[in-house]
Design a protein with these regions (language model features):
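Short, structured motif recognition centered on aromatic/hydrophobic residues
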Residues: 14-18, 32, 37, 51, ...
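An N-terminus-focused feature that recognizes amino-terminal "leader" regions
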Residues: 1-157, 314-316
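Active-site-adjacent "gating/activation" loops or surface patches in catalytic cores
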Residues: 220-238, 246
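N-terminal beta-strand motif that seeds the catalytic metal site of vicinal oxygen chelate
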Residues: 1-25, 79-82, 140-187, 246-255, ...
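Contiguous mid-protein beta-loop-alpha structural module that forms a pocket-lining wall or clamp
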Residues: 121-123, 132-133, 163-168, 206, ...
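Long, C-terminal catalytic modules of enzymes
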Residues: 308-314, 322, 326-347, 351-367
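Long compositionally biased, domain-poor regions of proteins
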Residues: 223-225, 246-320, 326-333
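Core segments of cupin and vicinal oxygen chelate
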Residues: 10-57, 98, 106-109, 117-120, ...
């Protein structure tokens, strides 16, 4: 991602980790292994496991009587925290509190890092991390080239510390689903605390329901968060998520790949369930995205979606729900900084059709 031109008061520099929890955390670990992640380290004093693929760090928190497990009792399988890389964690935390954020009383053990955190969407946490490998261009092995995992975690013997997996390399973006009327409030939260700016705005209508979304982007250009709410009075897919999750939260995580076809092949071979796309979608690809330069038969074979214009192509595919109502997006960018806007309506309508078939929605257009 290219850096933006506006002020970066916290020195944000991307995502550090995503923290997951569940009543059955073992199932999370099995899912992540299917997705190409490797368990590479264990927390020194807590029941927390670090899974890695490329530059993506997933934590599974199974510590009894912890914030994470209390979160799981309320939400089920869920994302209880995310972490932003910042220049100075202490200063970032202080500034966030001064601007109205709610702090979190982080219980730390002996010789454990105290990583400051504030309350985020749905009472999940946003951690501030200022230690990571390669920060400010520091070379490997140099003094100061240290991460939070070097301090708080012990490597699992024999585990590759830099696994390639299925070729997923970075966290591209994540989304929030919020109650109707709260989208602007959460957008202003990120703008006020982190100086995020609106990168995109969507207002998509299906046959029965609609959705609104503000996509917010950080000054570093590496943290992007579309915030979604229902766009009509009819309860649709956003409300279904809110009901299943018992509140607001993170809807999906988008993971980047440099070769989406290879990644999708790996995921399918590992039995990760991916969303289907009707064949007629591909009959219109060349008309909708002329001169895209991709092999339409190869995209059709793998059910990969395409969007953009010539020289600015985005390829994407979505998993089925994997962690409660949470799913994953696999994305490859070829000069395109969007979110697949051209696919949104098609995807939205396909999910809406599934809801109608399951009886969640009633199709009033046929009555």
């Amino acid at each position: 991602m290219q850096p933006t031109t506006w002020d970066n008061p916290l020195g944000t520099d991307g995502f550090e980790f995503i923290e997951y929890t569940a009543p059955d955390p073992v199932a999370l670990g099995k899912l992540f292994v299917q997705m190409g992640f490797t368990a590479i380290a264990k927390h020194r004093v807590k029941d927390v496991t670090l899974y890695r693929q490329g530059e993506i760090n997933f934590l599974v928190n199974a510590e009894p009587d912890s914030f994470a497990q209390r979160f799981a009792r309320m939400h089920g399988p869920s994302i209880c925290a995310i972490a932003f890389r910042v220049a100075d964690a202490g200063k970032a935390y202080k500034r966030a509190l001064e601007l109205g954020a709610w702090g979190f009383d982080n219980k730390t053990g002996p010789m454990e890092l105290n990583i400051p955190a504030i309350k985020g969407v749905g009472d999940s946490l946003i951690y501030f991390v200022d230690r990571w490998r390669g920060k400010n261009g520091v070379q490997p092995g140099s003094i100061g080239d240290i991460s939070i995992y070097d301090v708080d975690f012990e490597p699992i013997p024999g585990a590759d510390q830099h696994p390639v997996g299925h070729g997923l390399t970075y966290i591209d973006h994540l989304t929030h689903n919020v109650h109707r009327g709260r989208m602007v409030e959460w957008a202003e939260f990120y703008e006020r605390l982190f100086n995020f700016r609106e990168a995109r705005y969507f207002d998509i209508e299906g046959k029965v329901t609609a959705v609104k979304s503000k996509a917010m982007s950080s000054p570093c250009g590496k943290i992007r968060i579309p915030i979604n709410e229902e766009g009509s009075e009819t309860s649709g897919q956003i409300q279904e998520y809110l009901d299943a999750y018992h509140g607001e939260g993170i809807q999906h995580i988008a993971l980047g790949s440099a070769d989406i076809c290879s990644t999708v092949d790996g995921l399918r071979n590992a039995n990760v369930a991916l969303l289907d796309t009707i064949d007629t979608y591909y009959e219109l690809v060349d008309r909708r995205v002329p001169n895209h330069g991709e092999s339409t038969p190869e995209l059709r074979k793998r059910k990969i979606l395409i969007d953009g214009v010539a020289d600015e192509i985005l390829l994407q595919i979505f998993t089925e729900n994997q962690i409660g109502p949470i799913f994953f997006e696999i994305i490859q960018r070829k000069g395109n900084r969007g979110f697949g806007e051209g696919n949104f309506k098609a995807l939205f309508e396909s999910i809406e059709l599934d809801q109608i078939r399951r009886g969640v929605l009633k199709d009033t257009t046929t009555s």
